[in-house]
Amino acid sequence: MCPYFYWAIPCCCRGTRLGKRIAGINLSKNGSLAIINDGELEFYLEEERLSRIKRDRGAKYLVEKYLDGVDGVAICDCYTKYYPKKFLQRTKEKEAVCKVIRDKKIPILDYRQRHHECHAANARYGSPFDDCAVLVMDGKGSVHDHNGNRFCEIESIFDNENPVFKHYSTFWSEEECKKIEKPYWESMNTELLYSDRTSVGQAYRRVSRECGFDELDAGKTMGLSSYGSGRVDLFNEEYGHSLCSKELYAKEDSTGYYGNQKPVDLAYNLQKSAERHAIYMVAMAINLTNNNNVCVTGGFFLNCVSNYAIIKNVDVNLYVDPLSYDGGLSIGSAFLAYYEHFCN
């Protein structure tokens, strides 16, 4: 059983070849189901369309209705630090989904610890490129334990399917952040950065709360930014990377802001700082892979203004994943399962 989740998925297709129709199911926010048929996307739908619950994290209606004729199911998710009551509720919901799949006697593959890989697969296989770099930036992805500390992936760069850079952070926990004296690098086959800094996705959550919005209403914060002005310093180059300022810090309710800017100016600061950070990251992806074809994905890249800033400032052939938020994980996990268990 995966140590970060308390509901087990029996992976009954390990070492076997699956049929041609593979389903992917996302059980994080924007719960969704996708079907890949012989390497082509055949079907995609989000649970909220059936349940009428905005950003519904489940997939109960989807698995009951749309799994006929499917040869295997890939399950993906995202690590989230729940309060105990909410954790128990979410565990029951996820187990109910898995029970429906088991009752249908469909093999299950566990992709819950491959969050950024699923994002990257969705972008790469949906792009027009045969050879490309893939950049993933979001709030948080899968858990990674290292030197006795627990991190979450927040930025990843892939050379096609091969990881060349990973940024792991403890930002989601005040207790974990205190264990890291300063960001540090390690080099193996992949360049690894460990830090206590906030991800760009989480930065939008915190600033959105500070501006009086729901933490998932980053689009409102982006819109508000057009009315602001002032300094641009929430992402800066230090420790060999572009990192979020400590003005945004780990806090249980995600607000975490030390500064004193007005909401409109704080939104402006974050938007312009995030644009600068995105430009830095795309340039880094090109340098690490020696490839000007770059796919970008992860919830941050719903930021159209930032995407345009990349095009204006970087010599790049840019593909922006249209389903870069977590809903697209179902497509990515289905593609991964298809190419790992059917084509190979």
Region roles according to the model:
Residues 2-344:
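Short acidic/glycine-rich loops and adjacent helix/strand connectors
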